[in-house]
UniProtKB/Swiss-Prot annotation:
Expression sites (tissue/organ): Expressed by the venom gland.
UniProt keyword terms in alphabetical order: Disulfide bond, Hemostasis impairing toxin, Platelet aggregation activating toxin, Platelet aggregation inhibiting toxin, Secreted, Signal, Toxin
Protein name in UniProt: Snaclec echicetin subunit alpha
Region forming the signal peptide: 1-4
Species of provenance: Echis carinatus (Saw-scaled viper)
Amino acid sequence: GADEMCPPGWSSNGVYCYMLFKEPKTWDEAEKFCNKQGKDGHLLSIESKKEEILVDIVVSENIGKMYKIWTGLSERSKEQHCSSRWSDGSFFRSYEIAIRYSECFVLEKQSVFRTWVATPCENTFPFMCKYPVPR
């Protein structure tokens, strides 16, 4: 199957490998950790509805219904005031976002409602890493 190209325990959609890590880290620690997991590894970015569904499945299998996990989204990497970037450089395109005056974003889910919540980067949360499937 598609998972053969990712290490054991990692999930794949054929394009990326994904793994949820439950040990809480700060945003910076988590991003550095993800950088080491694979070539071009980063904190989770979600670039499509399909990817969002896969992430949902991986997270609910591991954490259950209520969760907050770090995403690769941070206000620090902003180039202009209206564009946020994921840590892997791709642009963030979603309207379900609650921007306050802090810098990093967790994905928070309560049953079916998914929201992006701005949270101080020093807080610690579980997180998901993602890197391209090795070719």
